[in-house]
Amino acid sequence: RIAIQGVGSVGGGVARRLAAEGAKLALAGVNLARAKALAEELGAELADSAAIMEVEADVLSPNALGAILTEASIEKLRVPIVAGGANNQLATAADGQRIHDRGIVYAPDYVINAGGIINVALEYLGQGSREEVESRIHLIPGRLAEIWAESKASGTPASVVADRMAQKLIGRG
């Protein structure tokens, strides 16, 4: 079961794709009418926007608001994985440590949703062929695996590992 927070273009797309694969979904969105319509369309459970953070599921996928992973909300999480497209999900850097301490696998937002910036950067640099963009996007799952492996091996939160990797990639680490 996947708990999806946000049912706009990103969250709605995630929900439709997962539903097509047979996943059971719990959906929540700020736009209640849109969330209700999508839940009915997909045969998903409708949850309150605040309550979605407490739904027991395999994955919480935040796809709307930033700063939703706070000290209080992390304590209430009932998922082993947090992976979604919302920007700046961690309210503070300390929240990355809190998620790590809870044993929750966290996919840092700027890694999981890097496809957009990859496309823009390659286009800006004049290297934006569809094939090049897709080849770079296909590297994202491997990067996540590297982040999680390093996090596990070093005991360092995935958010910190990802920050270090990003700094190294852009020549600042």
What is the predicted function of each stretch?
Residues 2-6:
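Conserved N-terminal Rossmann-fold NAD(P)-binding element of oxidoreductases
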Residues 10:
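Hydrophobic/small residue at the entry helix of a nucleotide-binding pocket
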Residues 13, 17-18:
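Rossmann-fold NAD(P)-dependent oxidoreductase module
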Residues 20-42:
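NAD(P)-binding Rossmann-fold cofactor-contacting core
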Residues 38-111:
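Rossmann-like adenosine-cofactor binding region
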Residues 80-173:
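Adenosine-phosphate binding glycine-rich loop
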